[in-house]
């Protein structure tokens, strides 16, 4: 079973985060204490691509697990993010560009004159919600939590419904001129060193049951495969299946009685010899 995928909706004018981190504790509903230790750990989701349409990545996963080369080229063609250019009035105007907006990296620290804003980067927090628009439970929406507020970003479908409602009521649209993109984060088997900036933290209390069960099933399958390849594990199983594995090392009753009589006879001979000496 493949690991779940996270999707984050953000404004095109904002920079994406390079990775999302999730730290899970032990699940009290797990059957075995050994399995609970397997489920606990830190998970790393790496930014793989940025899309303009939210249904492109999901469509590829519904059709086949491995996209073709043509699909990959089409995906990269959608990852072109529009850049901002100011007009005479100082108002940012969205214009198409061939340059892709990239998150700051460690190499950018030496090239930028003012790194104070980057070094003071505070890790944004995300909460995970189910994605009811897909048939599979692999893709989940990660909603960014606003700093200083308890409300979350609206769901992509809920956002479109609100915009449609406001447009029918002839009300002004506050975000009608803003473009949005979708960042796709895939789980990585190898967790690198946590960067000092440009990463997000997932709230462990907001993990849906389907998301957590997907992680747990993947860990269980990996644990079973590793146990099968372990020769020591096979040797222990073979010994435990043997009848003599559970037998104690105590002597039989007849052997114990014979040894006791021999010891008593030897003790009496020694005592008699000491008496005559």
Swiss-Prot record:
Associates with RNA polymerase II. The keyword Cell cycle does not apply. It is found in: Cytoplasm; Nucleus. Pfam families: Iwr1 (PF08574). InterPro entries: Iwr1, TF_Iwr1_dom. This is RNA polymerase II nuclear localization protein iwr1. GO terms for cellular component: cytoplasm; nucleus. Residues 251-277 have a biased composition (Acidic residues). It comes from Schizosaccharomyces pombe (strain 972 / ATCC 24843) (Fission yeast). Keywords: Cytoplasm, Nucleus, Protein transport, Transport. Directs RNA polymerase II nuclear import. One of its GO terms (biological process) is protein import into nucleus. Its main location: cytoplasm. Residues 222-277 are annotated as: Disordered. The keyword Thylakoid does not apply. Residues 225-234 have a biased composition (Basic and acidic residues). Belongs to the IWR1/SLC7A6OS family.
């Amino acid at each position: 079973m493949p690991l779940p995928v996270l999707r984050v909706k953000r404004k095109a004018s904002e920079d994406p985060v390079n990775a999302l981190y999730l730290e899970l504790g032990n699940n009290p509903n797990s059957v075995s204490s050994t399995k609970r230790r397997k489920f606990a750990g830190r998970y790393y989701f790496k930014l793989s691509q940025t899309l303009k349409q939210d249904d492109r990545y999901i469509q590829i996963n519904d059709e086949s697990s491995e996209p073709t080369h043509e699909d990959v080229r089409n995906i990269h063609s959608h990852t072109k993010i529009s850049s901002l250019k100011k007009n005479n009035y100082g108002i940012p105007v969205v214009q198409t560009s061939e340059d892709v907006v990239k998150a700051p990296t460690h190499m950018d620290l030496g090239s930028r004159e003012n790194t104070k804003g980057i070094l003071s980067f505070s890790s944004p927090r995300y909460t995970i919600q189910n994605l009811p628009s897909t048939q599979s439970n692999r893709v989940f929406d990660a909603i960014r939590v606003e700093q200083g507020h308890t409300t979350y970003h609206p769901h992509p479908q809920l956002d479109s419904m609100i915009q449609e409602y406001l447009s029918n009521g002839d009300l002004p649209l506050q975000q009608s001129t803003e473009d949005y993109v979708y960042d796709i984060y895939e789980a990585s088997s190898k967790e690198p060193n946590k960067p000092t900036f440009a990463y997000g933290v997932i709230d462990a209390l907001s993990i849906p049951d389907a998301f957590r069960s997907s992680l747990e099933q993947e860990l269980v399958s990996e644990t079973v495969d590793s146990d099968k390849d372990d020769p020591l594990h096979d040797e222990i199983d073979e010994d435990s299946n043997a009848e003599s594995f559970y037998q104690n090392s105590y002597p039989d009753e007849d052997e114990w009685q014979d040894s006791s009589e021999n010891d008593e006879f030897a003790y009496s001979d020694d005592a008699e010899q000491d008496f005559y000496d």
